[in-house]
């Protein structure tokens, strides 16, 4: 299992690893002498087991891992051993936790204990179900993750370059594993759709041609941080070109030929509901992605209620201002440059959010081959020993030239979104390395969307316009999330999807409905952390408000909990709840 901790802002179809004050440990912990030590041992063993499972984890967790020797496992990990190895790691972690006397732990240890238990229990359940991983999913599939892993591979030393070459050389084996994974899924009846193959094949030319290859371009950009001489850099650049030409490009060519062959017999997208134990898998996916204990049908009702209320609010706004729709379309942000926007947002956040001091980041636009559909941007958090490495990448094909979209996206990924959220937690609450790997996506994305709404007033919008702008956006996300539940849990096709969407948006053509189905069926549950996360965050703050003297204090209490799932957050933060 390899972890690349991305926080990405997703976009609708047309109609976001970690710094540290001090490392918890850089060596494996030996036998514990008391309860608190037993817990420390359990937490750190779990973390290092994950590091061992795929050496690239070590690179993304530490900039300078001199005190730890990578395992002999392939750099990119192995699909063929993933479930077996994952189950072994999880069962070992569960056994270690069971030896801990919970009532004797510190308050912080109890929090991390519950976070670990939540993560372990859910992921052990995955191991009991068929493998319905969305291998070719355009947004969450392994190809987009692989490309990001390679292009974001930072280079701070000559040893990093040597390790990078090893990673490149591992790509042919890894792609072969991906094919084996697809064939395994085919053997259990879970066949990638025509849409999934088409999306995967779109980058064929870019990934099989050396000129302007994203891996080479990324290397040439990243290598500058090593401080090596031009001669040394040129020599390594030639080595990278050789490995790409002789090993990586042929491997991608063969991989894409296999996809082309399989595409010929592919069919239209259909949700998890059509597969054996698919509904059980989706129930688990919902709990995992949202951080709640709601069933899919409970979640559907919850989101439908939010949709109904939101549309009523919009209708009232339109009745007061018949030109509101045109006003929203013509909005412009006070800044139009991404870096200038981030600086402005940082200043605004400092006025009403808990202080995080000075922070740094690197901001850039993605090359065409890495521009994933429906994904506006992402934030890659910093290594445990290098808090200054905060990376934000923007997808220009999705952001376009809309300055308000860019403004809210920078609020989502930067200040006071993921970058700020991450930095505050690391400065004020972080103690265990494992915390950085097992948080809830629903919680982190919920915060990022919540502060998007706050940022609209910082852009100079009046309250009514800001509410209408944000409501219009989040309702689209909620509607797509309901479609996701319908497609993957209830087996919706075009007719059911059309009937639902028509209720809220008027009649839509067949192709538009099919686009929604394609998105939801090929990346199941991918939108749920955003819509559910936002609404649950809003609900949580409403319930917390009376217990805090100011919004700033309330935000501080929330942020100190990190990315703990809502099922736990509600017990810690809502008055009269106990844990």
Model segments located where?
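N-terminal maturation segment of proteins
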Residues: 32-579
